[in-house]
Amino acid sequence: MTQAAAPQPWSDRFETALHPAIVVFNASIGFDLALIEYDLTGSQAHAQMLAEQDIISREEGEAIVAGLEQIRSEYRTGQFQPGLDAEDVHFAVERRLTELLGDVGKKLHTARSRNDQVGTDTRLYLRDRVDHIRQQLRDYQRVLLSQAEQHLETLIPGYTHLQRAQPLSLAHHLHAYLEMAERDWERLGDLRKRLNTSPLGAGALAGTTFPIDRQRTAALLGFERIYANSLDAVSDRDSLVEFLAAASLIMVHLSRLAEEVILWASEEFRFVRLSDRCATGSSITPQKKNPDVPELVRGKTGRVFGHLQALLVVLKGLPLAYNKDLQEDKEGLFDAVQTVESCLEAMTILFAEGLSFQPDRLAAAVEADFSNATDVADYLAARGVPFREAYNLVGRVVRTCLEQGKLLKDLSLAEWQALHPQFEADIYTAIAPQQVVAARNSLGGTGFEQVRSALASVRQRLEATC
């Protein structure tokens, strides 16, 4: 559906109006309205600086700041709802300000371009969202930590190649995801430092002839520094790429845990039970309880990956400085932010109240396999048998047990000693699952003391950043 073209601030250069279909095609107001609060804040800082520098009068500056605040109120109450004819959020605000203030409103854009304006708005927006996502990561970590602390001595099979390898403390398994989330939190913190740089005052690309104070607007908006090069200031989208890369890694980590929950909730595993609060039913099979939350997290991950790739492709061939291609940086950014925030919230709820681990089922799984085989080899190696020789011997023992339908614990002491004279009665203690886990007490290992210490460090870290 097309919409009649309205005059734009640049219309006097042209002899005919923009084609109605191109108005729609060109407009970004349908999505960049998400920046309106930041656009208003940035414009208020700009107007204040213009007045302080005597570029406009003090009275004009105060009127503009008040007018922008009125627009903010109108937007929040639904009275101000710009349409596609506004082209973008910046023109929409300027048009409404001019309606309120007349010619005074037209002075707001003095010494400013949409190029430095949109860069400022986007950084203000992303700075807020980064802070929010970092807080969400902390909330998610607290829930995982609570689960881990409850299950320090609960055992779970540890897998490589999705084959049972060695038993683990369930807390150790969850601690791995806590560490992934910590890296995500730190990565966003590093990004925020670079994000906190103001492009405002760079103009279209070359600066301005007016005696502006860029440091002042940066301070008013809470930026720590300004861009040193005006051309770089309006061309740079590094922080958006960095965010999308960091967001992609967050989603990788959430998706891996989601995949495990999906497996654990299956009838074949039954390691967790899903609560009614976080599962759905089937339209045809009444017995089912579907793990929709982790499945959606897993599915939404690809969206964020796609937004990262899309922005990289947009940027790779762009000459400096601004090109209309850069309008394509925002929809993917906004969607990625919303996706990460919703997935973090959903996974936090899932682990807070949406699932319960089944220790008996987990213990039975650990008991009924050969994941203690490495400990038999270690037992012999600790008694002087070369590890590779011990490894090969245990491999033959496992094959024999499989042929006879036995587990290692089912072998008699005589059978053990027939395999190698170094075996003593304490072999049964060495291969008991709790001992297998407890014995791995190397730094960072799954031994209970190591895990207890690791979780204490995590809790200390979280409490320090409440």
Swiss-Prot record:
Matches recorded under InterPro entries: Arg_succ_lyase_C, Argininosuccinate_lyase, Fumarase/histidase_N, Fumarate_lyase_fam, Fumarate_lyase_N, L-Aspartase-like
Keywords of the record: Amino-acid biosynthesis, Arginine biosynthesis, Cytoplasm, Lyase
NCBIfam families linked: argH
Gene Ontology cellular-component terms listed: cytosol
Catalysis performed (reactions): 2-(N(omega)-L-arginino)succinate = fumarate + L-arginine
Biological pathway: Amino-acid biosynthesis; L-arginine biosynthesis; L-arginine from L-ornithine and carbamoyl phosphate: step 3/3
Annotated protein name in UniProt: Argininosuccinate lyase
Protein family: Belongs to the lyase 1 family. Argininosuccinate lyase subfamily.
Cited HAMAP family: Arg_succ_lyase
Enzyme class: lyase
A GO molecular-function annotation: argininosuccinate lyase activity
Enzyme Commission no: 4.3.2.1
